[in-house]
C-alpha cells in the first residue's frame, strides 16, 4: 500500500476534519479487502437506485444512462480481475463510486443522492446472503440425494442401533441414513424460512431517518426482487437479525454434519469396520505408513466449532448497540462470510463423499448379533402372549443375565433354557416353540413395519417420499 494511497483515504467525508487520519487508523477501520466480495451486489443495488432516481425525476435520464455505462465497465473490470481496490477508499462502496466518477464524471457523483452507506451496505449484504442461501438450499438437496441413493442400496442392510453407544435394537442402514435426510430437510426448511426475513429492502432508510427526496422504495424492492421494504428506517440500517438468524441455521447444518462425521469416523475405525471412505477423501501419516485417516469428517467436526463461534460472535456484537447504525456493524461481515464459505464447502464435499462410501454388511451384521439386540423383541413377544410389559421386561432381563454367564446370545438358548432362565415360573409356558422367529435380526426389523419404522418396506417408502420432495 503506497503512502499516497493511504493519504487520500477519507475523501468522501474528510472536509469536516482539521487533521488527516493516521495510517494505523486507516488500516484499522478499512473493510475493502473483505467487503469487496459484495461488489457485484453493490452494483446491482446502485443500478436499481439510479433507475428509481431517474423515474422520480431526482436525476436526469442522461445521468442514469451514464451511470449504467460506467457500472457495466466496472463490472467487467471486477469480473476480469482488473479492478484496482484501494485501501485509501475505505470500502467496496467508495471504491466503486470513485471509479464510476472517474469514468462518467458528475453523473457518478449524483448516484449517492438519497442514500447512505448505512442503508447501502445493509442492502448489499441482504442481496449477497439471499443468493448464498439459495445456493445452500440447493447443496442441501444434493447431499440429501446422495444419502438417499446410499440408503436405497442398503434398505435391507442390518446394523445395530445404539443408545448410550450400547447396542440397543437392530435397524437397517438405510433407515439410519434417512435420519440424516430428515435433519438436512429441516435445515433446508430453516434456510428457506430465514430467506423470507433476509428478503426485505433497507435501501431508502438513508443514514437512519429516511430522506427528504421523493423516492419510491417499492419500485427499488421490485427491481431487486425483494418481497417488500423494511418498515422502519432506524431498524433498517441497524438490523442484523437476519445475519444472526442465518448463522443459527448454518450452525444447525454444521451440527448435523458433525454428528454424521462422528459416526463416519467411528464406523471407519478398524475396531468397528462398518464402512470405508474413498481414498480421495482421506490422508495418510508422515510417520505411520499404514494409516488412512478420515480427515474430511474430522475437519467438519472441527469447523462446526468455528461456525458456532461466529454465531456467538454476532450475538455479542449486537447485544450492546443503541439505535441506529454503529461502526461495530462492520464486524458482521467476516464471520458471516466465513460461515457461508464453511457451510458451502462442507456441503459440497460431503455430497461428493457419500457416494464413495463402501458399506461392509457382514461387519454390520456381526455387530448386530452381539449385545442382545433382539431383547426387546422377546419382551414384546411375551406381551403379545398376555404378560404385562413390566413382567416381560424383567423376564428378559433374567434371560440376558443368564446369557452373560454362559457367553451366548438369546437366540442360542433353546426353548427349554429360555423357560428355565426367565424366572416366569408357571407362566414360562408362554415361551413357545415359535419364539426364535422373533429373535432373528430380519424378523426384528421387519416387525417395525409402520410409518417411521425400520422395516425395509417402510425404508423404501420413505426414500420414495423424500425423493419426491427434493
Swiss-Prot record:
Its EC number is 4.3.2.1. One of its GO terms (biological process) is arginine biosynthetic process via ornithine. InterPro entries: Arg_succ_lyase_C, Argininosuccinate_lyase, Fumarase/histidase_N, Fumarate_lyase_CS, Fumarate_lyase_fam, Fumarate_lyase_N, L-Aspartase-like. It is an enzyme of class 4 (lyase). It catalyses: 2-(N(omega)-L-arginino)succinate = fumarate + L-arginine. SUPFAM superfamilies: L-aspartase-like. One of its GO terms (cellular component) is cytosol. Belongs to the lyase 1 family. Argininosuccinate lyase subfamily. HAMAP family: Arg_succ_lyase. This is Argininosuccinate lyase. It comes from Cupriavidus pinatubonensis (strain JMP 134 / LMG 1197) (Cupriavidus necator (strain JMP 134)).
Amino acid at each position: 500500500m503506497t503512502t499516497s494511497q493511504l493519504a487520500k483515504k477519507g475523501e468522501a467525508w474528510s472536509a469536516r476534519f482539521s487533521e488527516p487520519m493516521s495510517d494505523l487508523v486507516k488500516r484499522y477501520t478499512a473493510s475493502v479487502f473483505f467487503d469487496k466480495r459484495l461488489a457485484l451486489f453493490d452494483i446491482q443495488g446502485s443500478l436499481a437506485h439510479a433507475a428509481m432516481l431517474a423515474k422520480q425525476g431526482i436525476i436526469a435520464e442522461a445521468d442514469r444512462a451514464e451511470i449504467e455505462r460506467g457500472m457495466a465497465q466496472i463490472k467487467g473490470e471486477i469480473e476480469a480481475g482488473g479492478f484496482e481496490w484501494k485501501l485509501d477508499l475505505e470500502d467496496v462502496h467508495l471504491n466503486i463510486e470513485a471509479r464510476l466518477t472517474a469514468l462518467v464524471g458528475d453523473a457518478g457523483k449524483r448516484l449517492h443522492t438519497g442514500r447512505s452507506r448505512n442503508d447501502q451496505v445493509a442492502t448489499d449484504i441482504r442481496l449477497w446472503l439471499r443468493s448464498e442461501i439459495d445456493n445452500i438450499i440447493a447443496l442441501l438437496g444434493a447431499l440429501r440425494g446422495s444419502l438417499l441413493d446410499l440408503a436405497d442400496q442398503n434398505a435391507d442392510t442390518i446394523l445395530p442401533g445404539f443408545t448410550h453407544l450400547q447396542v440397543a435394537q437392530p435397524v437397517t442402514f438405510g433407515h439410519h441414513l434417512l435420519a440424516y435426510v430428515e435433519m438436512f430437510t429441516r435445515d433446508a426448511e430453516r434456510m428457506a424460512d430465514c430467506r423470507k426475513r433476509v428478503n426485505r429492502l433497507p435501501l431508502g432508510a438513508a443514514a437512519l431517518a429516511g430522506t427528504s427526496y421523493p423516492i419510491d422504495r417499492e419500485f427499488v424492492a421490485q427491481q431487486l426482487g425483494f418481497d417488500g421494504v423494511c418498515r422502519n428506517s432506524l431498524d433498517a440500517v441497524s438490523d442484523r437479525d437476519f445475519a444472526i438468524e442465518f448463522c443459527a441455521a448454518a450452525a444447525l447444518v454444521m451440527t448435523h454434519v458433525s454428528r454424521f462425521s462422528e459416526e463416519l469416523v467411528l464406523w471407519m475405525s478398524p475396531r468397528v469396520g462398518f464402512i470405508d471412505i474413498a481414498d480421495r477423501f482421506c490422508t495418510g501419516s508422515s510417520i505411520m505408513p499404514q494409516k488412512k485417516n478420515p480427515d474430511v469428517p474430522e475437519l467438519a467436526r472441527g469447523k462446526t466449532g468455528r461456525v458456532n463461534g461466529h454465531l456467538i460472535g454476532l450475538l455479542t456484537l449486537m447485544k450492546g448497540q443503541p439505535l441506529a447504525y454503529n461502526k461495530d456493524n462492520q464486524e458482521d461481515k467476516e464471520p458471516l462470510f466465513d460461515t457461508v464459505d464453511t457451510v458451502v464447502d462442507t456441503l459440497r464435499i460431503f455430497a461428493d463423499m457419500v457416494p464413495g462410501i463402501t458399506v461392509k454388511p457382514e461387519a454390520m451384521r456381526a455387530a448386530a448379533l452381539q449385545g442382545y439386540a433382539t431383547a426387546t423383541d422377546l419382551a414384546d413377544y411375551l406381551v403379545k402372549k398376555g404378560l404385562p410389559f413390566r413382567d416381560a421386561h424383567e423376564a428378559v432381563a433374567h434371560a440376558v443375565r443368564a446369557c452373560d454367564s454362559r457367553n451366548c446370545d438369546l437366540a442360542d438358548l433353546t426353548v427349554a433354557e429360555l423357560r428355565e432362565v426367565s424366572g416366569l415360573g408357571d407362566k414360562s409356558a408362554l415361551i413357545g416353540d415359535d419364539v426364535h422367529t422373533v429373535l432373528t435380526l430380519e424378523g426384528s426389523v421387519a416387525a417395525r413395519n409402520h410409518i417411521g419404522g425400520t422395516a425395509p418396506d417402510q425404508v423404501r417408502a420413505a426414500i420414495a417420499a423424500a425423493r419426491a420432495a427434493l
